[in-house]
A protein has these predicted regions:
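C-terminal accessory subdomain/extension
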Residues: 296-398
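Active-site-proximal beta-alpha core segment in soluble small-molecule metabolic enzymes
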Residues: 48-191, 196
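Active-site loop/helix belt of alpha/beta enzymes
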Residues: 147-271
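Active-site loop ensemble at the mouth of alpha/beta enzyme cores that anchors a bound cofactor
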Residues: 203-217, 223, 249-326
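Conserved, mostly hydrophobic/aromatic
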Residues: 28, 50, 82, 143, ...
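Flexible loop/turn segments at secondary-structure boundaries
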Residues: 54-56, 82, 194-197, 250-253, ...
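N-terminal glycine-rich anion-binding loops that anchor highly charged ligand groups
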Residues: 3-8, 27-57
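Generic N-terminal amphipathic, Lys/Arg-enriched alpha-helix
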Residues: 4-23
Length: 398
């Protein structure tokens, strides 16, 4: 499909209060369809809420195709908030140790909600078990297996779970026998070095040449580890309901693992700028933000109000918002995207003036919603609705 033009968006936005964030529903629906096709088979897709951060969009994705089932949350309070909003089947992607949060989640479990807590050490098990005993419930848990691979001189992956070996995983699995108020119902392994690392990112320079090789070797490594731990859990007769894997960038490899039951996807729905740099897939730029030209300091240079919405992670040029439309925008080396104003050099063919809009895409997906109270939903050339983000609902979970 052909993406909308600059004038398509400019006419929609130029008379509104700017900056604003938007989601193009036509492109979002296309992404939902394409992601479902990539994952088609015998697995479901769990939505990573941190990459969406808007309940209206979460509902749209869940309703778009039966393959979308359940949400991976990023904090306990977010999970409880989503329960209040009518969502269920929630998997926390990260451990929590706040006793009040755990107590409230155990209480929700007792009331019939499906919330699975993440653990990666015996201290987590004991903490949740003690609180679940107070509540009078058996709380389901998920073990986070580290999927990183160590090569000579290179740690290829992230620093998350201490369950880095099959032996460590078996040891933690055996610990469940000591506790009566927790149950092992899920395993998760997020292969960040495959799912979240593009092969064509200009900021990575010469590293791009070796990344595909490292990915291939890493997939072989962690696939074997994941299978061994799944087999071990089954040998212990635990009621394993979920084996969660993947991310937007590793759907194809994760779906090849027969023991995996579901794949988590998040960033692919909005398809932010960092997801332009993958070799094997391309999704549509469904979300972004619009700023307004308010100055022209000299010929060929314009300045917008706002724009400095920088992504998390290691500091780098690829964490800046990426100019989207019109084509021909070059950020200045001295200022980049600014706290209050963003200057840029322009060499494009579109005629632009004071009051016109300039479109950017955030480097990451859900973080866009931390800077705006609402998303303007666009469909077929019209703004059809304005929906609150988490921030617009008065929520700030991290």
């Amino acid at each position: 499909m052909s993406n909308p033009t600059y004038q398509y968006y400019n006419q929609l936005f130029k008379h509104l209060q700017l900056p604003l964030a938007y989601c193009d529903i036509n492109l979002l629906e296309k992404n939902c369809q394409d992601i479902a096709l990539r994952a088609a088979g015998n697995k479901t897709i769990r939505i990573a809420s941190k990459s969406v951060r808007c309940t209206a969009i979460l509902k749209r994705i869940l309703d778009s195709n039966p393959i979308y089932k359940g949400i991976m949350c990023f904090t306990g309070r977010e999970a409880l908030y989503l329960i209040e909003q009518g969502f269920d089947d929630l998997l926390l992607g990260y451990p929590i140790v706040n006793k009040d949060e755990i107590y409230d989640i155990c209480t929700a479990t007792k009331l019939g909600k499906k919330i699975i807590l993440m653990v990666d050490c015996e201290a987590h098990l004991k903490l949740v078990n003690d609180i679940a005993a107070q509540v009078g419930v058996i709380q389901p848990l998920c073990i986070d297996m580290d999927m990183s691979t160590d090569f000579p001189g290179i740690h290829f992956g992230v620093l998350r779970s201490p369950i880095t070996t099959v032996t460590a995983g078996k040891k933690l699995i055996d610990c469940f026998e000591q506790y009566s108020n927790i149950s092992l119902t899920a395993l998760m392994g997020y292969e960040a070095q495959v799912a979240g690392l593009g092969e064509k990112n200009p900021a990575n320079g010469i590293k791009n040449f070796v990344i595909p090789f490292l990915k291939k070797k890493s997939i072989t490594d962690y696939t074997k580890r994941r299978q061994e731990l799944v087999d071990y859990v089954k040998s212990k007769n635990y009621p394993l309901e979920i084996v969660n894997a993947g991310g937007t960038g590793s759907i194809e490899s994760s779906k090849q693992e027969n023991w995996v039951t579901e794949i988590t996807v998040g960033s692919g729905f909005y398809s932010p700028a960092l997801f332009d740099y993958y070799s094997d897939f391309k999704h549509q730029p469904a979300a972004g933000f619009a700023v307004q030209i308010v100055r022209q300091p000299k010929p060929g240079v314009y300045t917008c109000l706002g724009g400095g919405y920088i992504a998390s992670g290691t500091v780098g040029i690829d964490k800046q918002p990426k100019p989207y439309l019109p084509e021909g925008i070059q950020l200045t080396a001295n200022e980049g995207t600014g706290e209050v104003q963003t200057p840029f050099e322009y060499s494009g063919s579109e005629k632009i003036n004071l009051g016109d809009t300039i479109l950017f895409r955030h480097s990451k997906a859900g973080e866009l919603c931390e800077r705006f109270n609402e998303l303007h939903l666009i469909s077929d050339g019209k703004i059809i609705e304005k929906v609150p983000t988490y921030r617009g609902d008065g929520k700030c979970f991290l």
